[in-house]
Swiss-Prot record:
It is found in: Cytoplasm. Its EC number is 2.1.1.192. Reaction proceeds by a ping-pong mechanism involving intermediate methylation of a conserved cysteine residue. The active site is at residues 108, 362. It is an enzyme of class 2 (transferase). Belongs to the radical SAM superfamily. RlmN family. GO terms for molecular function: 4 iron, 4 sulfur cluster binding; metal ion binding; rRNA (adenine(2503)-C2-)-methyltransferase activity; rRNA binding; tRNA (adenine(37)-C2)-methyltransferase activity; tRNA binding. This is Probable dual-specificity RNA methyltransferase RlmN.
Length: 369
């Protein structure tokens, strides 16, 4: 059970897309529009269409003169992501979209509609450099970081799908965004933080979602967690822990060789103290690997010690990936694990796994044509 891939923190610089409206702050948009010889208010018009109306087609923006549309479109609304295909499951309420970026890079996002909410799971990198052996994305390696606008455009597209009733249940609203698709969000720190602002700033400066409805996941990049604490955001922090002991985590989550479990939990506590937000602990339960009763007891003890009331455990039955020798724990083992964690005073629930049939569930995104 050795980690064969190296950890990669710095993505290759190749292939980044042209600049886009969603890469820029409101002031930067005005400056960009002025550089093109247009009046500054055109920036707000473009933002109103893109963020407010979820419209990326500049030719349909008839309140902008035809002569300006081509110029503004080419420079500030280039097509970043083209859908290659949609795969649906759960009677159409789970949709995985494979996207092709301008340089041919492939990435995936997943829209999940529930009775009371709609969540999009988005990618922050094409591939991932964290090399976790039970995750298809990690085993594929890292191609490159996504730009702020490539991240935001996944959310805009999902919001438009919901508004237009493309998912069964009629027209609706996108309510939640989780950075749990391809990539380690905090390894693409600046662009992810900028994307959070675009997602949460009120329209027309952004998409207008509440910060409390956004979750940013990490395998435990301690300096980046501390840096995010200082940003004064109120998004939910999710830590992919997967085991409470350093010996096994060094293999399951290779970044643990750099920052140990206790350091990660201390950084998470700092975030919880600063924001008043509960930290979500993600734990993929793997048969005979990390599902032992003593690990449940240790997990509960450590989380109670470091995070107290500011924690919730999401237990994820392992989703199968091609070529993997591991599978999910049996249900009785899972139930006993939950019972033991709760006995330590730590809330623990089993995640409703969506999209397994179309390789859209946690750890399955491989962006293959």
């Amino acid at each position: 059970m050795s980690a064969s891939l190296p950890l990669v923190f710095d993505a290759p610089r190749r292939g980044m897309p042209p600049r886009h409206l969603a890469d820029l702050s409101a002031d930067e948009r005005r400056a960009a529009v002025t550089e093109l010889g247009e009046k500054p208010f055109r920036a707000r018009q473009l933002a109103h269409h893109y963020f407010g109306r979820l419209n990326a087609d500049v030719e349909s923006m008839t309140d902008i003169p035809a002569g300006s549309r081509a110029k503004l479109g080419a420079d500030l609304l280039p097509t970043l992501l083209t859908p290659v295909r949609n795969l649906d499951t759960d009677e159409g309420t789970t949709r995985k979209t494979l996207w092709r970026a301008h340089d041919g890079t492939l990435l995936e996002s997943v829209l999940m509609r529930y009775p009371d909410r709609a969540t999009v799971c988005i990618s922050s990198q094409a591939g991932c450099g964290m090399a976790c052996p039970f995750c298809a994305t990690g085993q594929g390696g890292l191609q490159r970081n996504l730009s702020t606008a490539e991240i935001v455009d996944q959310v805009r597209s999902a919001a438009a799908m919901m508004r237009d009733g493309e998912v069964p249940g009629g027209p609706g609203r996108l309510s939640n965004v989780v950075f749990m698709g391809m990539g380690e969000p905090l390894a693409n720190y600046k662009r992810v933080i900028n994307a959070v602002h675009r997602i949460c700033d009120p329209a027309p400066e952004g998409l207008g979602l509440s910060q409390r409805s956004v979750t940013v996941s990490t395998v435990g990049l301690v300096p980046a967690i501390r840096r995010m604490t200082a940003e004064d955001l109120h998004v939910t922090l999710a830590v992919s822990l997967h085991t409470p002991d350093d010996e096994l985590r060094d293999t399951l989550v290779p970044v643990n060789n750099r920052w140990k479990v206790e350091e990660v939990l201390q950084a998470a506590r700092g975030y919880a103290d600063h924001t008043g937000r509960r930290v979500s602990i993600e734990y993929a339960l793997i048969r005979d690997i990390n599902d032992q009763p003593w690990r449940a007891d240790l997990l509960g003890k450590l989380l109670h010690k470091h995070l107290g009331q500011f924690v919730h455990v999401n237990l994820i039955p392992l989703n199968p990936t091609p070529g993997s020798k591991w599978d999910a724990s049996p249900k009785p083992v899972e139930r006993e694990f939950v019972r033991r964690v709760r006995e330590a005073g730590v809330p623990c629930t089993v995640r409703d796994t969506r999209g397994q049939e179309i390789a859209a569930a946690c750890g399955q995104l491989a962006a293959e044509e």
